[in-house]
């Protein structure tokens, strides 16, 4: 696998960090997740392919344990606000002095500098500060919070994984690690580069929800079907639009020009009436195999059984019969080989990991006795 041999230490946090580390694990990295004592959940979320160690970083001896781990690791991933790691004597100046090859990835909401860097926030706040939230929503309505995919996972976790991989590549030339300041505000803003670069085009001249790509166009939106399901339409190009009109049983010469924005509301109503006449399955029979850019809106239950996804093996099933997406992208020479085992219990591998990093049995016993670490072998055997 592409990242085979790379050792990652992930400090537990909310979803963006675990996702970032899972991506690295899926592509071959050995990921140790450092969980906090008394964690709320027995099982790590987004823990595929990882091992879990419970360590109290608030105690100086716990911080010393992490320093030993980082001396023999390639990457440290930390999800805290500015100043937290420095307060624990675990800042990049210390850890990279002890291991100059260490890549120190900092994944936060607002970044390591600026007036918001020490403030709390969530996906919707990062979207708001990036400007992207102002573009999301229906005409005449408030901007609405989409699923927390855009800032947390795309602008945060995935962008951080990209930064780590670029830093690993740079290290092959320089021999040195570096600090990565990945944050969800700037990551999301970067994802919106197309919006920024096209602001002066007519593409975005109308208010939110009335433009071609934000639900304003009748040929780029969703429609309810007779059975209460939905079809997604994205027939932008004229040749695809003609196939849409044909599939709907309409005639182009009886409709306004496709790009007549003044007529879009009436056209949407007409299209909605037509889509409401047939079920989702019936519309699939009409549009499947065509270039009309019309597809069913699938639920999580349906997507696994869709022919295209089954043919490509786009979803995988774990030993516990949990279904999740196959890692992407598909590398033909060094594809990801995700773990099919269950996610680890919190602290399941504490002693095993410490032994691998050179801790003696006596040291591990003492750390356990002093509540610096926790080992949950009993839970793991249930």
From Swiss-Prot:
Substrate binds at residues 36, 55-58, 121-126. GO terms for biological process: bile acid biosynthetic process; bile acid metabolic process; fatty acid beta-oxidation using acyl-CoA oxidase. The keyword Signal does not apply. Belongs to the CoA-transferase III family. The gene is AMACR. It is linked to Alpha-methylacyl-CoA racemase deficiency: A rare autosomal recessive peroxisomal disorder characterized by elevated plasma concentrations of pristanic acid C27-bile-acid intermediates, and adult onset of variable neurodegenerative symptoms affecting the central and peripheral nervous systems. Features may include seizures, visual failure, sensorimotor neuropathy, spasticity, migraine, and white matter hyperintensities on brain imaging. Congenital bile acid synthesis defect 4: A disorder characterized by the presence of trihydroxycoprostanic acid in the bile and absence of cholic acid. Patients manifest neonatal jaundice, intrahepatic cholestasis and bile duct deficiency. This is Alpha-methylacyl-CoA racemase. Optimum pH is 7-8. It comes from the Eukaryota. The active site is at residues 122, 152. Its EC number is 5.1.99.4. It comes from Homo sapiens. The modification N6-acetyllysine is found at residues 58, 87. The modification N6-succinyllysine is found at residues 87, 268. A motif (Microbody targeting signal) lies at residues 380-382. The keyword Acetylation applies. GO terms for cellular component: cytoplasm; cytosol; intracellular membrane-bounded organelle; mitochondrion; peroxisomal matrix; peroxisome; plasma membrane.
